[in-house]
Amino acid sequence: MEPSALTLTEAAEAYLDHLRDARGCSPHTVSAYSRDLGKLLAWTGSKGPARAADLDKKTLQLFLSGQARALAASSQSRLLACLKGFGRWLMERGLPRNPAQTIAFPRKETKLVSVAGEAFLSEVLDDPGTDEGFEAARTRFCVEMFYGSGLRLSELTGLKWNQIARDGAWARVLGKGSRFRTVPLTDAAKASLDEYRGLCAAKGVATSAGPVLVSARGKPVGNRIIQRTVTDRLHAMGRRGKSSPHVLRHSFATHLLDHGADLMAVKEMLGHASLSTTQKYTHVSMAKLKETYAKAHPRA
C-alpha cells in the first residue's frame, strides 16, 4: 500500500512489522524503535501531519528540536537513525524522498565506558561466596561468561545448551543483527558451567537442549533477573561504581586491550559490526596509559 493511503500511525505499525518479520531485528531493537516512533506520533497528533505522505523534513526538524532538550545526544542519534530508516522504508513504497535523509546526526558526548578493575574482578571470580544454592551457581557462571567471554546480557539469556561445545571449550552465540559468533570459554567458566549443569541435572532440568539459564523450577529466566543477580553479586563484593553485566563486558574488552590484544580480534569477540564501535575501548586504555605515565615518569 502506498504511503498516501496510510495514516502516520498505520505506516509506523507497518514499519515495525517490517523490522520484526522481514528484517529479523531483535525484540530490543523493535521495542526501542517503537518508543521512538511513539514520540513522533504523540508530537504529530497535535502539531504535525496525520498522513504518512505529508511527512517532510521541516516537520522532522521541528520534532527533533523539541526532543533535543529532553534526550541525551546518544539517544537523539538513535532516534534519528529510526527516523531515517522509517523514511527510507516509506520512500521504497512510493514517497518521493526520504524526509530524514539530509538531517545531520547530533554530535555524541564522548563518555568513557564504565570498567571494573582487574584486581576487583579477580576477587569476585576467585571468591566462591557462602551460598551454594542453584541461583548462586547460576550467577557465578553468568559472571564468568560476561567477563571471560564478553557476552551481552541478551546473548547469555538466549543461549541454548546445544550452542555450547560438549567439552565446554566454546559457545556459539546469537548476537545483534541475527549474527552468530563463536566465543571461547575460560577454564573457570567451564568449571562453573559444569557445576551449574550438575545442579540442573539434579533437578531434572534438561541440559541437552533448551535455554541454559533457567530457574530452580526449570523455567527460562529473562534479562531482568540476571541483571539483578549479577549486579547484587558485584555490590556484595564491594563494587561502588556502575554495576551491571555490561560493565563486565566493557571490562572484558578493556582488559584485553590493556594486555596487548589486537583490536580486530577484540571486535570479533564482541560481535561488533563496525570497528569504530570497538575503538571506544581504546580511549579507556589510553586514559589508563596517561594516568600511569603521569604517576611514573619523572618529567610528567
Write out the residue ranges for each language-model feature.
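Conserved catalytic core of the tyrosine transesterase superfamily
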Residues: M1-A300
